[in-house]
């Protein structure tokens, strides 16, 4: 083991960012390092159960300043609907004084951050090294976040001709466009100004995209692996869902989860429900209530609950996704293909059906479907609309034992998972990354 160090972590205030940062913090703490985790107070309460080393990982609360347009009490992106997201980044920027004060008082050796592009300036002022630890895919960073690139257009030399936006993806780019452009500027600025770049991925999945980023930014890109939580270290699956799933045959249940960022229009939500119903398979759906509906039940299609009461559950609340995917009765995962969910799907034994909504999810989906060929994508019309029929066809194509495409993606998925779970591969990424940080900190102290 190298010299122990003290790292600051300042992730973007979204749970899809904070959670993998905390998983990495646990790995660092396991090796004897200290971490100060800078997040809002409310998020601290929601994440503390994931802190496996509370003596080594200390939460440092930040107060979110008031910004016109930001609802009172909002501290993370999950507190506000997408149209209001634009108001939170300026509020996060206003925490800079608090971050500087913490750096001055606690003297970390290293600061890990992702979207707060001013962190390298603070780090340099206090003679601390900065590392941009990115939790979105190298595929999408290389496509949308390189200097001089045009959003939505593959830059020169991009290492894939298959990972492209198509006409029907316009909805994903438009719905996210203003926020995504600002996000893009922040990320590119951070990548250009930080001392080191690291990404939550591995070369077996995204090696050529990581190499492309190294050439674009003239910096070594360090990889941590997927940084998934340790199995069996959290709470078990809730009894009510475990008992419900036990009532179905092995591999027969369709599990649908679209992430906390996706809120469907009511008509599209109903099409989702009807499409899954059309398969005739048992199903478990966990999505946020659609726009204009206070509860999921308010928005369900007429007669739906009565028709599916013995074989379907539709929830508008958070669920234990990794544990549901691991249940023997679950055989298909219908996902938005956020990067965390992408990894969880790969590490599961489920057939994978993808229904992306945001720009990075589209590219993740093309990686899974076109490059790796481990999944199928739900077909959309040019307007971006997906029909109940197209959804049902996609699910049935992978669940039908006689389906050629179903057998192809099953074989490819099985081979890929076999590589990733081979002895020492993913733990090797973690160990090598921690060794790298120890060496970087030691070299910095000798400068």
UniProtKB/Swiss-Prot annotation:
Pfam hit, one: UDPGT
Residues reported to bind UDP-alpha-D-glucose: 260, 319-321, 336-344, 358-361
Single GO term (MF): UDP-glucosyltransferase activity
The entry's keywords: Glycosyltransferase, Transferase
Cited InterPro entries: UDP-glycosyltransf_plant (IPR050481), UDP_glucos_trans (IPR002213), UDP_glycos_trans_CS (IPR035595)
Enzyme nomenclature, EC number: 2.4.1.-
Residue ranges of the TM segments: none
PANTHER family, per the entry: ANTHOCYANIDIN 3-O-GLUCOSIDE 2'''-O-XYLOSYLTRANSFERASE-RELATED, GLYCOSYLTRANSFERASE
Family the entry assigns: Belongs to the UDP-glycosyltransferase family.
Name of the protein described by the UniProt record: UDP-glycosyltransferase 79B10
Organism: Arabidopsis thaliana
Gene name of this polypeptide: UGT79B10
